[in-house]
Amino acid sequence: IGAGSSYTPELIDGLIARSSQLPISEVRLVDIDEGWHKAEIILSLTRRMFEHAGLPVKVILTQDRKEALTDVDFVCSQFRVGCLDARIRDERISLKHGMLGQETNGLGGFAKAQRSIPATLDICRDIEKYSPDAWLLNFTNPSGIVTEAVLRHTKVKVVGLCNVPVLMQKGIAQVLNAEEKDVFVQVAGLNHFIFARQVNYQGKDQMDFVLEEFLDDNQ
């Protein structure tokens, strides 16, 4: 849901890379009128990506939520109520008061939550109706707040996701000259406002070394 997002090809690429662990037969792309022209481009690209990978995955694009959510195993949410114009307003709210303009916390995050939560709960009501056993994978920001709303006010199984910890792990692995899978980073906090508490590599905490390397690179 929110298929016109530029992040969709990255998600599809992840599905292709993990097709042996997570075999799928169909992907249903969903968007609204405002994002339809972008979603049509994503539809064509998604089909070509699966074809190039040799995977027989059916891909459709729809605005019909019942069609999209009936008998599915996973629902991925990555929409933005109000589109990019709303993001501009959210970030300028904070800037107006001398704070960082951000869409996941602070004034901007709170404003975005006011729009994202009602829309997400509306989607969850349809998930409960048409696919009660499905998992909601929530990328919609502010991810932590939206996910908490789903947990508190619906019966939908949900996981809140953010790519910041993953990007942090990638950067740390480069500093350590290590494989990403061998680096464990313990993080705490809400999405886009997180702290690395420990970096474990080869059985040792490498936090001090990593911090020194990052500080040296930024001097």
Regions found by a protein language model. Give the residues of each.
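Short, surface-exposed basic-aromatic patches at helix termini and helix-loop junctions that form
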Residues: 17-20, 47-51, 129, 148-158, ...
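Rossmann-fold NAD(P)-binding glycine/threonine-rich loop
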Residues: 47, 81-153
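Glycine-rich phosphate-binding loop and adjoining beta1-alpha1-beta2 segment
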Residues: 17-54
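Gly/Ser/Thr-rich loops at beta-strand to alpha-helix junctions
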Residues: 4-8, 34-36, 83, 138-146, ...
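Substrate/ligand-engaging "lid" and interaction regions
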Residues: 156-157, 161-219
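N-terminal Rossmann-like dinucleotide-binding module
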Residues: 1-22, 30
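Short acidic low-complexity segments
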Residues: 58-71
